[in-house]
Each structure stands twice: as structure tokens, then as C-alpha cells.
A protein has these predicted regions:
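Conserved beta-strand-loop-alpha-helix junction that forms the acyl-donor binding cleft
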Residues: 109-124, 137-138
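Conserved GNAT-fold acetyl-CoA-binding loop/helix
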Residues: 21-39
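Conserved acetyl-CoA-binding loop-helix of GNAT-fold acetyltransferases
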Residues: 85-99, 121
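Conserved beta-hairpin
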Residues: 47-61
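A short beta-loop-alpha structural element at the N-terminal edge
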Residues: 1-18
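A conserved beta-strand-loop-helix scaffold within acyl/acetyltransferase catalytic domains
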Residues: 63-71
Length: 156
């Protein structure tokens, strides 16, 4: 089940985002330590969508979608270990469908740092296509790396 998360869901969203197998993959050198991270301000912003994924009442993952403009949203994917695989692909497509049905969104994009092969593979499995490279745009472990830009449109 996909649902829009609110401030009342902050504990679960924080738990997913700061999970030891998730946070290192979604954070860069400018982010706070996982224990200091608080998603509450993002959940309080009506322009940002946080879509939670639950299986039989158990939180499995979530997507944070931030607007670039009226119709384009950048997705940040956070799937807990044990829930990755075919079900996560279905859930990602459901989350994207939710955005297309319930918001002005007509395009979802994501940025994947060079070297994050699992994230790149997942994005392509859910139908995203490579659209370009943003050179030297991500700082991780003291190294500056490129990011791959991928996207999918409502019509696709």
C-alpha cells in the first residue's frame, strides 16, 4: 500500500531513511549524522511528497519527492533490506502512479551518484531512462563524483 506520509509518520520515515543500509546511500558529505537527521520539516512542507510503502501494516520503504518546478519532481528512494526486489519494483511504479494521479506531476527524475550500481539498476527496472550526466556534482567520502540523471514521463 502506498500512502502520503504526514508529520505523524515522522518516526517511521526517519527510521527508514536513517537505516544503516539506507542512509549511507542517500546522504552526502554535507548531511548530518544519521542520528541527528530529522525529516519533520520536509513532512511539514505541502510541496514535498513523502510516499510510504507498507506491506500488511509493516513499513517497507518510502519515496521523497521534491518539486523542481510545477510538473517535475525529483525522487529519493529508500527501501529497507528484505523488501528489495520484485515487490519494490511494483511499489515504485505504484508510487509514481500516485504522483501522476494526485499531483500536477508529469515527470519524475532521479540523480544517482557514479558507482551506485544497485540504484541505477533499480531506476532502470522501474522504467526510468538515462537523460544525462551532471558532472562533478556529488561529494561522498571526500570525493567529487558525477551523477546520472534519469527520468520518466507521465505518458511513458
Amino acid at each position: 500500500m502506498i500512502k502520503r506520509c504526514r508529520v505523524t509518520d515522522a518516526n517511521e520515515v526517519n527510521r527508514i531513511m536513517t537505516h544503516p543500509d539506507v542512509y549511507p546511500k542517500i546522504s552526502d558529505d554535507g548531511c548530518p549524522e544519521a542520528g541527528d537527521y530529522d525529516v519533520t520539516p520536509l513532512l511539514e512542507c505541502d510541496a514535498i511528497y513523502c510516499l510510504g510503502w507498507m506491506i500488511d501494516g509493516i513499513w517497507a520503504g518510502m519515496w521523497l519527492l521534491k518539486p523542481w518546478n510545477t510538473i517535475t519532481y525529483e525522487a529519493h528512494t529508500c527501501i529497507l533490506p528484505g523488501f528489495r526486489g520484485a515487490a519494490a519494483i511494483v511499489a515504485a511504479n505504484d508510487a509514481r502512479g500516485w504522483m501522476f494521479r494526485n499531483t500536477p506531476c508529469r515527470k519524475v527524475v532521479t540523480l544517482i551518484p557514479k558507482g551506485n550500481k544497485p540504484a541505477l539498476a533499480f531506476a532502470m527496472l522501474v522504467g526510468m531512462k538515462k537523460e544525462g550526466i551532471i558532472k562533478r556534482s556529488f561529494l561522498k567520502g571526500g570525493k567529487v563524483v558525477d551523477q546520472q540523471l534519469l527520468g520518466i514521463e507521465k505518458e511513458e
